[in-house]
Design a protein with these regions (language model features):
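Extracellular polysaccharide-degrading/modifying enzymes targeting complex plant/algal/animal polysaccharides
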Residues: 1-189
Length: 189
């Protein structure tokens, strides 16, 4: 769980032990595409990690833009820090250094390789591997004058799409999976 939040400087503090696999012996971030998945009340944010600074038993995590600004500007849902230990939960992802459980995989964008930790008894020579490359399979568009209506899909299966936005621009949601493209305040400065 997170330890504290510094909204002004756009920093989340987490236990240092939770990020030890992402930093080298000098404290530098070695997993340049690492992400934090942050549970905050009724939605989950995906935040690309820009830097980590260990400070004793905690670590200050800063995030890439635009999601850092959006995350710390919008009024809710906020990362929770409570007096009874029910702070927002998080986990780290998108780093080869985090692979420690069979079935996990990591896509190294720079090397153009996928690293996979096989499950017991799994033979990669016999595995069916599918790499989704398309985000949109069907697009239905309309206007007020020409609305899209009376559309039905029957006996069709849509499979194997991808959604790369969180890894490319972060994902700061509001509600029902809707993501914010900009921050806002209830009391503008």
């Amino acid at each position: 769980r997170i330890c504290s939040v510094d909204e002004k400087n756009e920093i989340l503090y987490v236990p240092a032990v939770s990020i030890c696999r992402l930093i080298d012996n000098k404290g530098n971030l070695k997993a340049k595409y690492a992400e934090m998945v942050l549970h905050q009340m009724w939605c989950v944010a995906n935040l690309r990690i820009r830097s980590v600074e260990v400070q004793g038993d905690s670590a200050a995590i800063r995030f890439h833009q635009p999601e850092s600004r959006i995350q710390f500007e919008h009024p809710w849902p906020r990362p929770m820090v409570t007096t009874n230990g029910h702070n927002s939960a998080f986990y780290l992802t998108n780093a080869r250094e985090l692979q420690d459980v069979p079935g996990e995989w990591y896509h190294d964008i720079d090397a153009r390789k996928v690293y996979y930790y096989p499950r017991e008894g799994e033979k990669m020579q016999e595995a069916e591997v599918i790499v989704p490359a398309v985000e949109t399979l069907v697009r239905v568009e309309g206007t007020l004058d020409r609305p899209a209506c009376h559309i039905r899909f029957e006996k069709i299966t849509f499979s194997y799409t991808t959604w790369m936005r969180p890894s490319e621009k972060g994902h700061v949601p509001l509600q029902a999976g809707m993501y914010l493209t900009d921050g806002y305040r209830l009391d503008p400065k």
